[in-house]
């Protein structure tokens, strides 16, 4: 079973979503199904079929979240050195073709937020950076083609969700 690294915030966010699905959304959709069923012929009852589809989506998400939380590995990135790129590292990189600098922080798969520079540890660029040190170059295949980057700095900055 592959562990999924995430911060305590990410774990709590997923756990809250799972609790809401189980405690609120699942019972509500059961009521919707019962109400729609009381309207008669199920073959031509669009309300009933929509509620059943909604129920399937909720059950699917519950299964997905349950699996993810079972595999969660909560990591406190402040507890270790950031001498190489790891989960929780803030990394400044430079595109060697354009000399454009970008800063990214590696976070769990459910915590990505590109506006804040938070990228999933499962993203192609994060995977290519893992284990690298300052001054190292790495290549990554992006939608626009292969690009080469240099790691300018690595440090830890507390996450601000």
UniProtKB/Swiss-Prot annotation:
Taxonomy, superkingdom: Bacteria
GO MF annotation, one: RNA polymerase binding
Coiled-coil ranges (or none): 45-73
Disulfide bonds listed in the record: none
Keywords for the protein's UniProt record, in alphabetical order: Coiled coil, DNA-binding, Transcription, Transcription regulation
Keyword DNA repair assigned: no
Gene3D superfamilies per UniProt: Transcription elongation factor, GreA/GreB, C-terminal domain, Transcription elongation factor, GreA/GreB, N-terminal domain
Any Pfam family hit: GreA_GreB
InterPro entries, per database record: GreA/GreB_C_sf, TF_GreA/GreB_CS, Tscrpt_elong_fac_GreA, Tscrpt_elong_fac_GreA/B, Tscrpt_elong_fac_GreA/B_C, Tscrpt_elong_fac_GreA/B_fam, Tscrpt_elong_fac_GreA/B_N, Tscrpt_elong_fac_GreA/B_N_sf
GO BP, sorted A to Z: DNA-templated transcription elongation; regulation of DNA-templated transcription elongation
Protein family: Belongs to the GreA/GreB family.
Known role: Necessary for efficient RNA polymerase transcription elongation past template-encoded arresting sites. The arresting sites in DNA have the property of trapping a certain fraction of elongating RNA polymerases that pass through, resulting in locked ternary complexes. Cleavage of the nascent transcript by cleavage factors such as GreA or GreB allows the resumption of elongation from the new 3'terminus. GreA releases sequences of 2 to 3 nucleotides.
HAMAP family linked: GreA_GreB
Protein name in UniProt: Transcription elongation factor GreA
Protein species of origin: Campylobacter jejuni subsp. jejuni serotype O:2 (strain ATCC 700819 / NCTC 11168)
Gene this chain is encoded by: greA
């Amino acid at each position: 079973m592959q562990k999924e690294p995430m911060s305590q915030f990410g774990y709590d966010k997923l756990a809250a979503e799972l609790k809401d699905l189980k405690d609120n959304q699942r019972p509500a959709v059961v009521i919707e199904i019962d109400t729609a069923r009381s309207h008669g012929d199920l073959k031509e009852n669009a309300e009933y079929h929509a509620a059943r589809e909604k129920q399937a989506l909720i059950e699917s998400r519950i299964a997905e979240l349950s699996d993810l939380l079972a595999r969660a590995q909560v990591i406190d990135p402040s507890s270790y050195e950031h001498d190489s790129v790891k989960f929780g590292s803030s990394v400044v990189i430079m595109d060697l073709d354009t000399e454009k600098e970008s800063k990214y922080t590696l976070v769990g798969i459910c915590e990505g937020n590109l506006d804040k520079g938070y990228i999933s540890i499962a993203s192609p660029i994060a995977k290519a950076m893992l284990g690298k040190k300052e001054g190292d170059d790495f290549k990554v295949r992006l939608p626009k083609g292969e690009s080469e980057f240099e790691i300018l700095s690595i440090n830890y900055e507390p996450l601000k969700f």
